[in-house]
């Protein structure tokens, strides 16, 4: 960790007021980071000091001892740190990961008494990126982390999966319509079809809120189905009432949590959830009238998030469609209308102008969503 130039008085205050995370036995060469910063672990590394209280994301990638250039997949975990707090963790050589089991209180207190001697082995938190980190996580609370993080608390770039069936016997393979072992595969598609059904290992899956696949209520008429397929407010309200009954604003914490897991944790599933949740928020016109404060905050969140990703990242490789421009086009057509709250409308107009100038995205064309919508009717419902 490179030392940062910091005012001596500020450094002294942070030493006594900031939090400290000690990580023992982390192998030399490991890629280690906290929030927006990462380094290669040296022989003296024991952790990070002067960390501002709040939510932080620590991440790391182990390296192959035989070939140090081979870096493993990123893993990470969230910590809620308090003023003058001390967290003691250690590296598990067996599992090649940070053991998140709490250290004995006696060990923590002994470490606290020895902090000044340990100081030379602790890297200072880089305050240059603190504002950026806060802008990406200001709606993530300790409760958000507890609700969404996996039961084992480890955020893994690659899912730890197991086959739904053990596949030890031929009858198991037949149950999933898989050919006998050794049978020649004739195409790539056939190869994909042969892969067994997998499921995440228990306790390792990020516990995102379940988003509805049916956007309309049971027993809806064809006209209602069309309405709820164009304006997703019914589906959004279902999520808010079920998952965030006391505070609808907490959905923004989940949006930020998913983005951080993708951006810093390299979790692709988190990016997919972020897209689905954003799509639900942006296509809910009636909800904008009811939850205008939520949407004002959503614009601020998107302003900071979109500053971290290249403009062409959202373009589908196959279709060349840009998920974000099409989604935001619908959002702006609603948020910039005369019917919404004036503060929300002004902020949406400024944000639209900012994106048009920065990314050269065109929001002027009529959204495809304004075209006639073809919806699948549930069984038993016929057009009159």
UniProtKB/Swiss-Prot annotation:
Keywords: Acetylation, mRNA processing, mRNA splicing, Spliceosome. CDD domains: Aar2_C (cd13778), Aar2_N (cd13777). The modification N-acetylalanine is found at residue 2. GO terms for cellular component: spliceosomal complex. It comes from the Eukaryota. The keyword Ribosomal protein does not apply. PANTHER family: A1 CISTRON SPLICING FACTOR AAR2-RELATED (PTHR12689), PROTEIN AAR2 HOMOLOG (PTHR12689:SF4). Belongs to the AAR2 family. Interacts with PRPF8 (via RNase H homology domain). Component of a U5 snRNP complex that contains PRPF8. Component of the U5 snRNP complex that is required for spliceosome assembly and for pre-mRNA splicing. This is Protein AAR2 homolog. It comes from Pongo abelii. The lineage of its organism: Eukaryota, Metazoa, Chordata, Craniata, Vertebrata.
